[in-house]
Amino acid sequence: MSGKQSEEFKRTEKMTRMEYLFPVRFAVGWMFLDGGLRKAVLKPAKLDPNSASFVGGKLVNFLPHAGPFKGLLLMTLENRSLDVTFLTVFSYIEIIAGLFIIIGLLTRLAALGALAMSVGFAPAYWLGSTCEDEWQIGALLTAGSVTLMLTAAGRVWGLDYFLYKKLGDRPIANVPILKWIKLW
């Protein structure tokens, strides 16, 4: 095999391995997109504090196990407008992160946001206040988000390919820990 053929083979082999991450990217993105859409679009009553479907009730169940988030959560629950605002913003962040992960746009940054959401609500997953298996969903979303954040999964079958081709690697910020996390 000539040098040029060998180089092309290595590139093709690497692309194939990265293609295997597309199902992970799609599944993680869909979980976040679906979670946000179910609250904000498909059943807006979940964001209505006067509705029996209001998602804020789950936050009350989570309060005793909130750990370091207890003060913030208590402040949110005591102020109804803040509660609704938090849940609405959170829902739209889920939609944006999920959509960006699915289409492969700023995948690493979107996966970092997804990871923050997954880890932030990890105590609620482990509590399983509304479903016995929530911890499994949380664990998979955390693992999937870490995988997508550490790889360039959006560069294969995603819009990050075009950003990388035009601009090269770009860190989130030139801060020691953040320079290792690339935007695409």
From Swiss-Prot:
Activity modulation: Inhibited by sulfite, metabisulfite and dithonite.
pH behavior: Optimum pH is around 5, the pH range of activity varies in tested buffers.
CC per GO annotation: membrane; oxidoreductase complex; plasma membrane
Localization per Swiss-Prot or TrEMBL: Cell membrane
Notes on temperature effects: Increasing activity in the range between 20 and 92 degrees Celsius.
Catalyzed chemical reaction(s): 6-decylubiquinone + 2 thiosulfate = 6-decylubiquinol + tetrathionate
Transmembrane segments: 21-38, 86-106, 109-129, 137-157
EC class: oxidoreductase
GO molecular function: quinone binding; thiosulfate dehydrogenase (quinone) activity
Keywords tagged on the record: Cell membrane, Electron transport, Membrane, Oxidoreductase, Quinone, Respiratory chain, Transmembrane, Transmembrane helix, Transport
EC number: 1.8.5.2
Topology of this chain in the membrane: Multi-pass membrane protein
UniProt function note: TQO plays a role in sulfur oxidation and is proposed to couple sulfur oxidation to dioxygen reduction; caldariellaquinone or sulfolobus quinone seem to serve to transfer electrons to the electron transport chain terminal oxidase formed by DoxBCE.
Subunit structure: Heterodimer of a large and a small subunit in a 2:2 stoichiometry. TQO may associate with the terminal oxidase formed by doxBCE.
Name of the molecule in the record: Thiosulfate dehydrogenase [quinone] large subunit
